[in-house]
C-alpha cells in the first residue's frame, strides 16, 4: 500500500498508530456488568502486573480517562493531605506533576533542571537530606516533551534509603523500557493504554503498592479518582464503580496479546530502539540535529532542532509531511524551536525511513535549504 492510499502514520507519543487487530477488537459491544467483561478487565490487570513484576507486592488499579487522570488519582489517593511531595522537573510533564499537587492542595517543593539535563540520584540525596518534611518524591521516567530518560533505578534507591515514597509517571516508558517492581521500590507507577502497549487512549492504570493503597482510605479529594475505593469495589464485585471504557479495555486486551506474541518487553524495546536509531541516522543525513545526546535519549520520541532557514514554518512543514502520509508532533520546549518525531506505535524501521524521505521531500518543496 502506498503512503497516499493508507491512513496517515502517527509518529507521535500517543495516540499512536495501532494494528488492524487492535482496531478490530473494538467492533464488539460489551455490557459493563457482564461477567465476560469482568473477566476481560481482570485478565488485563493480571497481564499488566506481570510486565512490571508486581504480582506479589502491587495492585493494578485501572481508571477511565487519559493518563493525566491516573496521575492525578495516584497523587490524590496516595499522598495524605499533610504529606509533602518533592517534584523533579526537566520538562512540561514534570511541571504538570507540580500543577496537580498545587490544585490538590498537597504541599510540595520542586527541583528543576534544564530540559536536556536529567535529575541525578545525588540531587535527590541532597534534597531529601535538606528537607525531612518530604514524604513522597514524584518524577517522570521518560519526559515526553524531549525524550529524555531520567535515572529511575538510582533515584528509587535513594528515596527508599531515606524512608520516603516514590511516585513514577511512566506514561511514555512502561512496556518498552524495563521497570521491575522487585528491584525498583515505588508506591505508585502510572501508565496508560495508548502508549508503548499500542492500545488506544482512554484508560490509565496505576500500579500501587498494596499496603500503601490499603492505608490510603479517606485521602482522596475526589469520588471518581479515589483509587482505594475503585480497587475495593473491584475486588468485591469484579466491576468498575462507574461506566468503564469497554472498547478501550477490549483493544488493550488484544494489544497485550500482540505484545506477548512479539516477545514482550525485550522485543518491543528492540523494535523501538531500531526505529529510533534509524530515525536519528536518516535525519542526520538531512542535516538535522537532535536536541539530546544519545546517552540520555529514550527510544520513544526524538526532539529535533527546527531548521534555521527563515522560510521554515512548522505549520507548513507539518501539512506537507502529513500529505505524504505521516503526522509529526510540534516541539514543547520553551527556549529553542523544535519539533518531535515519535518512534513508538505499530511501525518499524522501514516506515521510519519512509517518514524521513517524506520530510526531505517536504523541505525541498518548501525550499527550506538551511537545516
Swiss-Prot record:
The keyword Transferase applies. Signal peptide: none annotated. Its EC number is 2.6.1.37. Keywords: Aminotransferase, Pyridoxal phosphate, Pyruvate, Transferase. One of its GO terms (biological process) is organic phosphonate catabolic process. The keyword Transferase applies. Coiled coil: none annotated. Gene3D superfamilies: Aspartate Aminotransferase, domain 1, Type I PLP-dependent aspartate aminotransferase-like (Major domain). Its cofactor is pyridoxal 5'-phosphate. It catalyses: (2-aminoethyl)phosphonate + pyruvate = phosphonoacetaldehyde + L-alanine. It is an enzyme of class 2 (transferase). The modification N6-(pyridoxal phosphate)lysine is found at residue 195. It comes from the Bacteria. GO terms for molecular function: 2-aminoethylphosphonate-pyruvate transaminase activity. HAMAP family: PhnW_aminotrans_5. PANTHER family: 2-AMINOETHYLPHOSPHONATE--PYRUVATE TRANSAMINASE. Involved in phosphonate degradation. Belongs to the class-V pyridoxal-phosphate-dependent aminotransferase family. PhnW subfamily. Homodimer. This is 2-aminoethylphosphonate--pyruvate transaminase.
